Curated annotation (Swiss-Prot):
Lineage: Bacteria, Pseudomonadati, Pseudomonadota, Gammaproteobacteria, Enterobacterales
Key word Protein transport present: no
Entry function: Specifically methylates the guanine in position 2445 (m2G2445) and the guanine in position 2069 (m7G2069) of 23S rRNA.
SUPFAM superfamilies (alphabetical): S-adenosyl-L-methionine-dependent methyltransferases
UniProt EC number: 2.1.1.173, 2.1.1.264
Name this protein carries in UniProt: Ribosomal RNA large subunit methyltransferase K/L
Keyword Phosphoprotein: no
Organism of derivation: Yersinia enterocolitica serotype O:8 / biotype 1B (strain NCTC 13174 / 8081)
Molecular function in Gene Ontology: 23S rRNA (guanine(2445)-N(2))-methyltransferase activity; RNA binding; rRNA (guanine-N7-)-methyltransferase activity
Amino acid sequence: MNSLFASTARGLEELLKSELEALGAHDCKIVQGGVHFQGDDRLMYQSLLWSRLASRILLPLNDFKVYSDLDLYLGVQAIDWPSIFGVDKTFAVHFSGVNDEIRNSQYGALKVKDAIVDSFTRKLDQRPTVAKQQPDIRVNVFLQRDMASVALDLSGEGLHQRGYRDLTGQAPLKENLAAAIIQRSGWQLGTPMADPMCGSGTLLIEAAMMASDRAPGLHREHWGFTAWNAFNQELWRELTTEAQVRARRGLQETTSRFFGSDIDRRVIEMARANARRAGVAELITFNANDVSKLVNPLPEGPVGTVISNPPYGERLDSEPALIALHNMLGRIMKASFGGWRLSLFSASPELLSCLQLRAEREFKAKNGPLDCVQKNYQLAANPQGAVGVQVAEDYANRLRKNVKKLDKWAKQQGIECYRLYDADLPDYNVAVDRYGSKVVVQEYAPPKTIDAQKARQRLFDVINATLAVLNLPSNQLVLKTRERQKGKNQYEKLAQKGEFLLVSEYNAKLWVNLTDYLDTGLFLDHRIARQMLGKMSQGKDFLNLFAYTGTASVHAGLGGARSTTTVDMSRTYLEWAEKNLRANGLTGQQHRLIQADCLSWLSNTDEQFDVIFIDPPTFSNSKRMETTFDVQRDHLVLMKELKRLLRRKGTIMFSNNKRGFQMDLDGIKALGLEAKEITAQTQSEDFARNRQIHNCWLVTHSHEEK
């Protein structure tokens, strides 16, 4: 009787125990990451040949205490290695774990290798060769605290390497994990199975091998036991011959049929080739198709199971498309697969919620380093009787109401960029902005008291509802996650797509970039202020400080300004401002662009202007600025400098985004200036729900000074 250990992915231990017991294993004991079991030689080889769930089968050789590297060396050397494999064979050591003395797995592996080589040298005066690639013998050493376990790896390469999958797509599932997903899905032998996002076909091939009674190890060419001195070649030949007979018979007798599709034709060709190598090609029909074209392959029956590992994104810009994909999949399942079962495996439970289906069972498992979930659904035989899940219903109703009102208003105003929703409901803390045919959803960073997964789920619900309410293709929605504006946050680069969109604002054409920066290049809340500046600037010299992308300069120029001067510290935004001016025919020396620290430039210029627009950051400590700037603290210093540049009958429009900003009216008066708040006049219909989005003032010379 052999004492053996089968390793597996975390979360699959119970399944593996049941599988080993079905093969005839005794005394099965679950530990984290595997199962200890007992069995004779036949069972040992059967477990290697037939286990669909094990990662490796190990034959323990020795356990011993390790308090030093010498203990490790002596414990390994105590094993009679020449009795295990011949000196003419190659070997490799896999070492995992550390303790206070063995702090590096590479060092541990080196000590083990030395002990094995020295064991041969002492007994035979010869040494075996170490081979990193496809060694004849693999020695596995696991160190935990002060205990080392040495085992012979009978598998060789991991058992998930069945031998049929030479080619894979971008994100392949390991075969043993795929087998576990199938076993947990509720799929029954003899019934059909479909995978609408099958990639290189692993789930379908594994299920077809189960249905046709094909041993998962039947196609493997290399094993870790064939160079073992105790290898029973005759018994192994008997077991593989028996497995071949069962596979041929199973292929003829199975009534299961399998259907796979994927949008990538190249991957579908890989899947077909993999199925041929696995010996199950005749059971699987593959098609290159988008999920949107998914149809029930057996509309007249019988019913079966849809099993898939749909894509999930780690990049923010992929999430709208994935949310739309899952939402569409849910609709197709309800409409066309009545009576079927559905089982999806994903690293994103939030995406699975976008199916708008209620799961009846849920399992957890690891896919490499990723925590994953598998959810099983029973699809109603009558689609009208399906139990759906309402997603963000309050948000959807509010957005629908806002859209009905604001779309009509925007058309009357002659604008195509406006805010549809701005954290109207506390549970859905996002802003939704329309830019022509596109929509930007910005999530404000949730408070630390809100559970991160709950916040992410709400965001996914918002995107799902937004796509539905606006009837929007997913590639027309841009998602951003941001904190409320602070200092120079708008200058942070998020991506490098370089995709610009030309939009209309009254009579101006303006370039926006919806993906690359935290902001888009157009502050929507200042729309009326820009319109006012255009009317104020006819025949005037106009100065735009902290100009960003120069949109105010465009309106001033179109309003008939004699000259525009646009000052900003960022070369990127000045180039953008130039692009905006050019789009409106505002070129020539009268339209200047100056790259400078605005505060320093103010202190060093004596130029005079009739209209000055300044929208400074609330706070700034840019590397290019020698001192910090706080708009509440420093606005009088700013006004003193601006007064020098302002002609007698000139006007300063001063705006900022600081909540609770208090203009020092006494200080303004002492400077010989007058300030009038015009915040209410600059707030448009789409920002009526957020009166604190900005504050705005007109500042002029006092009557005494004039």
